[in-house]
């Protein structure tokens, strides 16, 4: 047995310190543009989780509606993550020919196509 098999208080303290350090570094080292995008991603993720929870709890009676909403949430999340990767200054070397404005225009175009497909699927 290792020496770490003691009480869980030390582990909880270290998890708390990791969370505090993450929040401090995220607050100081992340641009406001990325923070807004992260808030959007959190909203879309929670929307998809809520829809999935509703599906498990209540049912999927209008199945096309459930699938459309869930596909919209998942697709929007994926497109948002792609946008975040492209506009992150740390990834500038990988996306040299793409400006943040171009990445946002691509995001809007892909989101429009996604939602046209979703609306078509609803019927």
Curated annotation (Swiss-Prot):
Name which cysteines form disulfide bonds.
none
Supply the InterPro entries for this chain. DAD/Ost2
Renumbered to this chain, the signal peptide range is none
**Pathway(s) the chain acts in:** Protein modification; protein glycosylation
Show the PANTHER family listed in the entry: DOLICHYL-DIPHOSPHOOLIGOSACCHARIDE--PROTEIN GLYCOSYLTRANSFERASE SUBUNIT DAD1
Explain the purpose of this protein: Subunit of the oligosaccharyl transferase (OST) complex that catalyzes the initial transfer of a defined glycan (Glc(3)Man(9)GlcNAc(2) in eukaryotes) from the lipid carrier dolichol-pyrophosphate to an asparagine residue within an Asn-X-Ser/Thr consensus motif in nascent polypeptide chains, the first step in protein N-glycosylation. N-glycosylation occurs cotranslationally and the complex associates with the Sec61 complex at the channel-forming translocon complex that mediates protein translocation across the endoplasmic reticulum (ER). All subunits are required for a maximal enzyme activity.
Q: What is this protein called?
A: Dolichyl-diphosphooligosaccharide--protein glycosyltransferase subunit DAD1
Name of the gene encoding the protein in the UniProt record: DAD1
